[in-house]
Amino acid sequence: MLDIYLGVGMFIAIVLALVLIIMFAKSKLVPEGEVTISINGDPDKAITAQPGDKLLGALANSGIFVSSACGGGGSCGQCRVDIKAGGGEILPTELDHISKREAKEGCRLSCQVSIKQDMDIELPEEIFGIKKWDCEVISNDNKATFIKELKLKIPNGESVPFRAGGYIQIEAPPHHVKYKDFDVPEEYRGDWERFGFFDIESKVDDETIRAYSMANYPEEEGIIMLNVRVASPPPNNLSLPAGKMSSYIWSLKEGDKATISGPFGEFFAKKTDAEMVFIGGGAGMAPMRSHIFDQLRRLKTDRKISFWYGARSLREMFYVEDFDMLQKENDNFKWHVALSDPQPEDNWEGMTGFIHQVLLENYLKDHPAPEDCEFYMCGPPMMNAAVISMLKDLGVEDENIMLDDFGG
């Protein structure tokens, strides 16, 4: 019996010793109370934060919203900040997005940086113009089988000062979404039923943040328009998780609330006189529409512009009336559609095939100087890769190839 008591006593003593060691180490490694984060050397911009918080979250808590399309997961590489002091060693998770030269200069991913001491960081001045809005859903309608147009109303008296090609981030609270509750019009339900998509559910326990490009242009004021493709699991494995954010967005109905922040962006048009060639597919339509409307309606440019859009079938086409109208109004604008899998009921007499092949065969191969054009593209990853490869073969330099990774 004495041996048992001694054993229990020794065990308790060891546990207490370990606890004391951990508490001592924590007291040395993590400061108590708040720490100060100096920003751009401006005392008025300095904030305080709790040790152990991530830098991205601490900035957001103080109303400074750094772009993070993945919501802080470390996968998008957008939440870059320059840390001049107090950031510690760069983590392996950051090195996929930050070069050795950039790391040496202090570049870090704010979602991966844990606050341990006072810090000194630098942020672009435009970040301080980023705000958050609680919007109301005006409509959420199918534009194609798997693409909805979400239209949000900005609060009265407010505006989102975005540029064409820009994007916002939208927040989704924890939720449980059942695909059977989605409002899918009869003309699109066939594929949904055939693939068993109405049986899918998406249950998310944490807040989610994702980025979406605007489909409207700056003069369409008071609203934000997004094209959102539902990220369903592949039909041959419906047990895989559905897209967290797209499932949430597809569940939104008129009158619902949605929180956005922004504006953000890098996918902006160059201020030159060069010919502009836009190439899109799928939900990559969004920034294409924003850019083209902005060029022709707001800027009233006389630059030569063409738009090449690829869809599977006629049922997957949208904004046709918009682009037909722009083409009629502007002699310097032409737009073209290619269907990769036209259906018998389409009675399609237009171009067929993948859009990069159609663009090459019907325009670029006979173009006197494709290398002098500016190419703006947004679509599915395979489309983007094929277009870039084709442009490289034509001698187009990187500086004339602009890619939006979010719209597809």
UniProtKB/Swiss-Prot annotation:
EC number: 7.2.1.1
One MF term in the entry's GO annotations: oxidoreductase activity, acting on NAD(P)H, quinone or similar compound as acceptor
UniProt enzyme class: translocase
GO terms for biological process, alphabetical: sodium ion transport
CDD domains in the record: NADH_quinone_reductase
Swiss-Prot/TrEMBL cofactor(s): [2Fe-2S] cluster; FAD
Family: Belongs to the NqrF family.
Protein name: Na(+)-translocating NADH-quinone reductase subunit F
Organism of provenance: Pseudoalteromonas atlantica (strain T6c / ATCC BAA-1087)
Gene responsible for this protein: nqrF
